[in-house]
Structures are given as C-alpha cells and as structure tokens.
C-alpha cells in the first residue's frame, strides 16, 4: 500500500485469518487500531504476532454491544469482520449477521464516522 494512512480504525471481529491479514496491512500503514474480539486475553497473542503494535484489544460479545460505542470515539472508520459459521444454542447467528451490522450503522451515523465497511 505505502500510503501511510495515519488513521484510527475500529475492527470488529478481527481475530481470524482475514482479520490478521487486515491488521498487518493497517499496521504497515501506521494506523491506530481498536480491535474488538470475543477472545479473552487476545492482546497477548497480538503482541506475539505483531511486536510493538499499535492495537488496543477489547473483549466484547453480542450481549454487550455498548462496549463498542463506548470505545469508538474519534475513529475514522469501522470495519466489520465479525461472523459465525453456524447457529448455536443461543440463536446468535441471526443477531451477529443482522443486528450487529445494523447497530454499527446506527453508531456510525450518531458519531459521524464516515466510513463503515
């Protein structure tokens, strides 16, 4: 890329293959990243993968969407990578794939975040 974007970006659900690849690209562009993940203690794993990174890792789940809104102040962009492959006993498949994107759209408008991917 080589553009040195120097922006603050929130990544929702970036702990999988695509997420790690995206994080690498964003770090190479000097982006400040807020990563929301369901995984506990994921910051330690990130520090091993990306030493001296500029990533703040926040644990969240579908039942606590407000933690996202509380931590996206002054971000330039939200990138939604969250997803699950199959339904679970809690019925989260629909919520993750419809309610979360709707919520992200709502908070993007409310907080004047111009880019939602």
Describe every region a protein language model picked out.
Residues 2-3, 7-29:
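N-terminal Rossmann NAD(P)H-binding glycine-rich loop of SDR-like oxidoreductase domains
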Residues 8, 76-77, 115:
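Structural motif
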Residues 10, 32-34, 56, 117:
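A structural signal for isolated positions on well-ordered beta-strands in alpha/beta enzyme cores
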Residues 13, 82, 117:
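Active-site beta-alpha turn of Rossmann-fold NAD(P)-dependent dehydrogenases/reductases
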Residues 31, 110-115:
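A short helix->loop->beta-strand "cap" motif at the edges of active sites that frequently abuts
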Residues 36-41, 61-62:
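N-terminal Rossmann-fold cofactor-binding loop
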Residues 42-54:
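Short, conserved SAM-binding/catalytic segment
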Residues 51, 56-107:
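NAD(P)H-binding glycine-rich loop region in Rossmannoid oxidoreductase-like domains
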């Amino acid at each position: 890329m080589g553009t040195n974007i120097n922006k603050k970006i929130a990544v929702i659900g970036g702990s999988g293959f695509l997420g790690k690849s995206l994080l690498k690209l964003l770090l190479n562009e000097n982006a400040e990243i807020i990563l929301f993940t369901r995984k506990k203690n994921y910051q330690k794993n990130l520090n091993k993968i990306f030493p001296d990174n500029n990533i703040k890792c926040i644990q969240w789940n579908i039942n606590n969407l407000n933690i996202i809104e509380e931590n996206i102040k002054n971000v330039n962009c939200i990138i939604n990578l969250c997803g699950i492959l199959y339904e679970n006993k809690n019925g989260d498949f629909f919520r993750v794939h419809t309610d979360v994107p709707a919520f992200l759209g709502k908070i993007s408008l409310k907080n004047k975040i111009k880019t939602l991917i």
